[in-house]
Amino acid sequence: MRKTTALEIADIFSCSLDTAELPISFNVAPTSRVLGIVNSGGGPSVGAFSWGLIPRWAPDTSRAASLINARIETVGEKPSFRDLLAQHRCVLPMDGYFEWNEQLRHDAMKPIKQPYYFSADSQSGYSHRGVLAVAGLWTAWKDPNQPNSPVVHTVVALTTDANDMVSKVHHRMPVLLDPSGVSLWLDQNNVDPLAHIQVVDNEALVVCAVSTKVNNSRNNGSELIEPIMLTQPQPVEELKLF
């Protein structure tokens, strides 16, 4: 979820702006356009990417919707990701993100997918003026069957085991970066970027239950992140999204 503009992101992270403004989105779905910060040698810059990695060797775009997240524990082993660790790291700025678990509610006939909204605690070291910084990887893909087609830049977000607070909702969470972590992740001279990833403390994020309207990607408004009161929720089973 992003309500911060590209221009504001460039200011917060002290980088240049290399994209036209993208629309604000309270409900970012796979393959949507998102902002990413990269360092291609001339210093960090904010660019536009499609969320869902298309490996450079892919014959088409069919894999994009399924490659939105990658486990940091195995990212160095998977063919789709390992070659990107050296020079294709990026930071994905966001105001928050959604996670779900299944719950039985007395006002529903069957389990529902209850969404929760996670955002930065303003006092946390992981808050960049209220914005979260998530470690990611990016690549550039060109349709091998269309020589004149444009290059498509895509990204994948890295996830890790959830801390105690997040695990009450989901067993995974994004790999969050503090200011020094952002610098190290984007540093092209950093030959072992995974070694600098830190465990995120329970105070880094705040969470609230939100409306199930977010379950429909066609809904996209500020009401999607407004807290709601749940009616005696009873967790059934955690969804295995990552």
Where are the regions that the model predicts?
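Short linear sequence motif anchored by a di-proline
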Residues: 1-242
